[in-house]
A protein has these predicted regions:
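Juxta-kinase regulatory segment immediately upstream of eukaryotic protein kinase catalytic domains
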Residues: 2-74
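Conserved ATP-binding subdomain of kinase catalytic cores across diverse folds
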Residues: 48-194, 220, 224
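AlphaC helix of the protein kinase catalytic domain
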Residues: 193-204
Length: 298
């Protein structure tokens, strides 16, 4: 069974599980009479604090009803730091075409502290606020508590970065909410098919120029705010029907406060320009870096 057919099967199970309780013939059922089915849970939105929810103004597609059910439709991507799941959040029985009744979300769930991101975390976290000494020691010892602390910290760091960049107008998925080690965000794709990464895209020369200008514009938006992605590459840039969207953002750095900030910004420039150069589009990493440094220090 391929991924798409698996997602379709999960969606069919979710519809079957919820159609009867919320159908027209069952309108008299009390809310308490309904229970989520397999691969489902009640929407976690009502349980989150205001600070754990995405910034205002919120998009009209956002589902905030306490009657909504979250259904896991399948795994989209397994990564080194986290797994990405496709979630449908919907109010069963409500017209799906009406904004606020149903939407697809990406659930990024951080796994553990044994991988690349956590091992190199000090590079990115210098200049950030301090943690409790107990937490610092636990993370350094890689105890079970320390691993959990690290997972939660990176989830909240990604949510904070997405929220900040959304407010700046940068092209990133809208952050819906964060809870423990899970970040729920806008799903970027066509239907249930995730948008391809830049590394998978083959474009015309004009198309490549447009993609580069979008990416440079994204980097410029961050630089104006004194920030850098910190790990930018063709693998964490999605191309959604011609629009570039940046993902994987827990390591966003304050270029000035972090001693490694300008080095990380330079690496971002090199990674981007190397890919475009391989596609036979002229791109000067040093020129891009100099321009962005000027934006940071302006």
């Amino acid at each position: 069974m391929n991924m798409l057919s698996s997602l379709d099967d999960s969606a069919a199970r979710s519809r079957a599980a919820t159609a009867a309780p919320f159908g027209a013939a069952s309108a008299s059922l009390a809310f308490s009479d309904v229970e989520p089915g397999e691969d489902q849970r009640w929407s976690t939105w009502p349980a989150t604090q205001p600070s754990e929810r995405g910034p205002q103004p919120r998009p009209e597609w956002l589902v905030t009803s306490a009657a909504a059910i979250d259904t896991e439709l399948g795994i989209v991507k397994t990564g080194k730091e986290a797994d990405l799941w496709l979630i449908e959040r919907a109010v069963p029985g409500a017209p799906a075409e009406v904004p606020g009744n149903a939407t697809l979300l990406a659930a990024k769930r951080y796994r553990g502290a044994e991988n690349r991101l956590f091992h190199r975390s000090a590079i990115y976290t210098e200049g950030r606020g301090t943690r409790r000494s107990r937490d610092v020691r636990a993370v350094q010892r890689s105890s079970s508590y320390g691993r959990e602390v690290a997972r939660v910290e990176w989830a909240y760091a990604e949510f904070a970065a997405l929220s900040r960049l959304t407010e700046l107008g940068a092209a990133v998925p809208y952050p819906v909410q964060v809870s423990e080690t899970e970040v729920l965000m806008e799903f970027i794709g066509d239907g249930r098919v995730a948008a391809p990464r830049l590394a998978q895209v083959r474009a015309t020369p004009d198309g490549l120029r447009d993609l580069f200008h979008q990416i440079a514009g994204f980097m410029r938006t961050l630089a104006h705010a004194g920030l850098a992605h910190g790990d930018l590459s063709p693998y964490n840039l999605l191309v959604d029907r011609g629009r570039v969207v940046a993902i994987d953002l827990p390591q966003v750095v304050d270029v000035v406060a972090n001693p490694n900030g300008f080095d990380l910004l330079h690496r971002d420039c090199v990674n981007v320009c190397e890919w475009f150069t391989r596609q036979r589009l002229e791109c000067d990493a040093e020129e891009l870096f100099a321009e962005l440094v000027g934006d940071v220090t302006r």
